[in-house]
């Protein structure tokens, strides 16, 4: 058991009989004296894939579940199934396209480093991406000279179909770093 203020992104909890994976946490500190800090957590239900949102006070107790994390590499596509290979013992992990539809927007053809498969008692639960990914812009409007002084943005499409807002000075062919959870531009990639 852990208090709500000890829960971190990527942990798994058992709440109301559901196995939930923590996707995001917003901390809300009320201005009234004596009011408890609230933790608004966004989960994904591991078994159904549905998104769940709950609020907790800092001292609410939640049952945490230990998950096994295995580093994986994208291997190949078989029909509507995506196969990832364990980096250490070469065990294949298969996901249906619907299970990882959101994650696929961040995985270009060659794959990305830092992916992990979450398992519990031998059952594959989810695919976890790193916090940031580097991707190449394949389509955007031409860059505007001198636009680095303004904060205006424009849409840019990646090879996977993902569209993010980028500063006007960027052009097609440039590599950028994207925050996965927030789907936002962070900067140019190294």
From Swiss-Prot:
Disulfide bonds: none annotated. Transmembrane segments: none annotated. SUPFAM superfamilies: Nucleic acid-binding proteins (SSF50249), Translation proteins SH3-like domain (SSF50104). GO terms for cellular component: cytoplasm. GO terms for biological process: peptide biosynthetic process. It holds the Pfam family Elong-fact-P_C. Gene3D superfamilies: 2.30.30.30, Nucleic acid-binding proteins. One of its GO terms (molecular function) is translation elongation factor activity. InterPro entries: Elong-fact-P_C (IPR015365), NA-bd_OB-fold (IPR012340), Rib_uL2_dom2 (IPR014722), Transl_elong_fac_P/YeiP (IPR020599), Transl_elong_KOW-like (IPR013185), Transl_elong_p-like_YeiP (IPR011897), Transl_elong_P/YeiP_cen (IPR001059), Transl_elong_P/YeiP_CS (IPR013852). HAMAP family: EFP (MF_00646). Belongs to the elongation factor P family. PANTHER family: ELONGATION FACTOR P (PTHR30053), TRANSLATION ELONGATION FACTOR KOW-LIKE DOMAIN-CONTAINING PROTEIN (PTHR30053:SF14). NCBIfam families: PRK00529.1, PRK04542.1, yeiP. This is Elongation factor P-like protein.
């Amino acid at each position: 058991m852990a208090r709500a203020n000890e829960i971190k992104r990527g942990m798994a909890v058992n709440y109301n009989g559901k196995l939930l994976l923590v996707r995001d946490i917003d901390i809300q500190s009320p201005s009234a004296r004596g009011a408890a800090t609230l933790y608004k957590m966004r989960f994904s239900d591991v078994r159904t894939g549905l998104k769940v949102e709950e609020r907790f006070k800092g001292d609410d107790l939640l049952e945490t579940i230990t998950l096994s994390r295995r580093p994986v590499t994208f291997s190949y596509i078989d029909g509507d199934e995506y196969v990832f290979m364990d980096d250490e013992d070469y065990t294949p992990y298969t996901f249906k396209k619907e299970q990882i539809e959101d994650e696929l927007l961040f995985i270009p053809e060659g794959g990305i480093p830092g992916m992990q498969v979450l398992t519990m008692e031998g059952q594959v639960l989810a695919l976890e991406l790193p916090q940031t990914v580097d991707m190449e812009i394949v389509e955007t409007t031409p860059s505007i000279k001198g636009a680095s002084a303004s904060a205006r943005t424009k849409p840019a499409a990646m090879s996977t179909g993902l569209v993010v807002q980028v500063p006007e000075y960027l052009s097609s062919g440039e590599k950028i770093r994207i925050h996965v959870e927030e789907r936002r531009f962070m900067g140019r990639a190294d």
